[in-house]
Amino acid sequence: MKISYNWLKQYLKLDLAAEETGVILTDLGLEVEGIEPFESVKGGLKGVVVGLVLECEKHPNADKLKITKVDVGQEAPLQIVCGAPNVAKGQKVPVATIGTVLYDHEGKPFEIKKGKIRGEESYGMICAEDELGLGESHEGIMVLDDKYAVGTPCAEVFQVETDEVFEIGLTPNRADAMSHYGVARDLRAGLIQKGVSLELITPSVTKFHVDNRSVKVDIEVTNKKLVPRYTGVAISNVRVGESPAWLQNRLKAIGITPKNNVVDATNYVLHGLGQPLHAFDADHIVGRKLIVKTAEAGTAFTTLDGVKRTLDAEDLMICDAEKPLCIAGVLGGQDSGVTHSTRNVFLESAYFDPVSVRKTAKRHSISTDASYRFERGINIEDCKYALMYAAVLIENIAGGVISSDVIDFYPKKKDDFQVFLAFENVDKLIGQKIPRDTIKSILHSLDIKVSSLTERGLGLLIPSYRVDVQREADVIEEILRIYGYNNISFSEKINASMSHSSKYDDLNMQNVVAAQLTGQGYYEIMTNSLVSEKEITSYEAAPEEAVKLLNPLSSDLGYMRTNLLFSGLEVVSYNINRKRSDLRLFEFGKNYRLSGGKYDEQKHLLLYLTGNQLPQSWTTTPRPVSFFELKGSVEALFERLGLKEVTTLPLEPTDNVAAEGFRWMYGETLLGTMGVVKHKILKDFDIKQEVLYADLHWDTLLEQVRGHKVVYKEISKYPEVRRDLALLLDDKVSFADLYRVAFATEKSILKQINLFDVYQGDKLAAGKKSYAVSFILQEENKTLTDKQIDKTMQKLQTAFEQSLGATLRE
């Protein structure tokens, strides 16, 4: 936000340097990010003076050039070659002396140097208005009034104004400071705390007077919730034209291009007082009635920027008897504004619901100075005052007379918000006891009234313009802000309390899992959640569930992704194309769907494995990554999270991603899937090597983890015992089945089961296979006996025979 120092000093008579003021504003929380000089004429016309043309003779070597002698107040006149057709002896003219840097009307700089033109020396330049940056005309030199003395700086002649402009990084909650008056109000409070008492100068509206009632415009508000206050007044016989220099300079200083005196007046009030206004051409209001209502869905409407928009049923509009004129609080319509032919103006000043304005502005991708303020909340009590001030200003600079009473639709006055401030809480939150009189003084400087006083604290009434102060903590923050953060002493002692929660925090769990995966050589990636329509139509089984953006940044980013996998494959492809083909990647991200008319977001964890397990070296040969390597990484995660009874099932037939793979199950709950990406999909991403993936449903995983308590115990000091079995099984029986039956049978001393050999061949019957399995047994409190070991192994063997039809292989 840009704040002009000259403008600021209209409300507060400051004699501080801009840098000092900037420091105070920053201390108050209005961070000054920079201070830039401003000149109403770029370059400030430094080096340009009033000259008197003493002689004007024809150039001997050029028909269109003249040689002049010009007195600029130096010891001797300057010889200047000039090509302007209107230059003549006896004229007072602006002269740019050697070394002067001028800026033309487009802002391009050029330096005046000694030169030789067609054989004749020239020691300066007699200037046209475009060369000085004062206009666009180049028809001839500027001829000045004879009253100006020779040598007078042209900066004085043209009343060049200099200013310093603060660039303030305003936080979104500070709606009260989104104007010069608001900044001045805050600055005054800070100065009072420093012992400097200044009067805050509020612009007067005492000259507001209804001259006649010749222009009648009625108002109808259909939704009091969205429009709690609407004011307006008519001004007739205005003359729309150029604004006076002082007003143009104020607007130019903060980057606003002057339009005409009426529009400039509304912008001046907007940036001066913080109240957005709109000026209608009253003669274009059909039926002389404004109706504030929501739009009919699908209505076409062209805004001031020339863009044709389709309105939504929730868009709040200002309409006349036939058509919409404005998107309330956002932007006017193409035919609603003031033009040079306008003679009668209806001025609007209103309060529109912040949420409604924000939704409409976002829906149509519009951001204006008005919507920026309405979205954050303006001062509802200032609507009428700002309207009257703007009307008086327009009278002064555009002529005309006020031709109606002020219409003020304000059915329910908004009461000041009440907060109780406990002194104990002030001391506790700030960490230091602030004198009670100081607290009261600060509150008074902030216009926060004390409605009641007790030993415990203060009852307060918050002014209407402080829409961000709603709680006791907000008031305490305001006290601290004005008191000064630098005035709070910090104790060398640290007081802290230890807290423990049994709940699993999403971010903490992400960090735990990320640490484990990075320890295994995986790299975390982050991808864009926006995808193309092609991705949705190519891979999504239910494309109607995809979430489409209303205003995409580009056609390639028109949808929210439905599957995180494809975002990761883009990263895999990108790296492979840059000769990094051995990849271990993981990503936490969300999938987005529209289900049953509601938006659904599901968080996933994706792992990707491709290329070689180890790089080639003199001790190793390249070995491709394996399905079991990725499976081991996932199982290690489950173990780290305390999920020990995870099983696998074949993929659903409807799975359209994996060529082969399986599902991870925890009881009846699906935790995720794992597999090899289909060749067709890899081809679409220009990937020519196998890619393994694991897709874990992170939200579901956390739900299961929350039900588990991680228990730490001492490592047993008693020895482990290993026993092996060679089991003959049906082809359909998996190691996971063996694993499940084993731990269901023996939970006490069975610690581990491993598959170390698989055999299928001619020596076995058709449909049979042999598993060689090792079992690790251990007792926590004593050494296992042979009898105990044999009994356990027999129990396991019997369970395998009964549950899986297994037999011992001879």
Regions found by a protein language model. Give the residues of each.
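Beta-rich nucleic-acid/ligand-interaction surfaces
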Residues: S40-G44, K207-H209, S497-M498, S502, ...
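Mobile "lid/hinge" segments at catalytic clefts and subdomain interfaces of large enzymes
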Residues: R118-G133, S137-V143, A155-E164, I168, ...
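Terminal amphipathic helices with adjacent charged low-complexity linkers/tails
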Residues: L187, L191-V221, A398-V426, Q432-K433
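Extended, well-folded interaction surfaces typified by the phenylalanyl-tRNA synthetase beta subunit core
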Residues: V419-S581, R723, I776-N781, Q788, ...
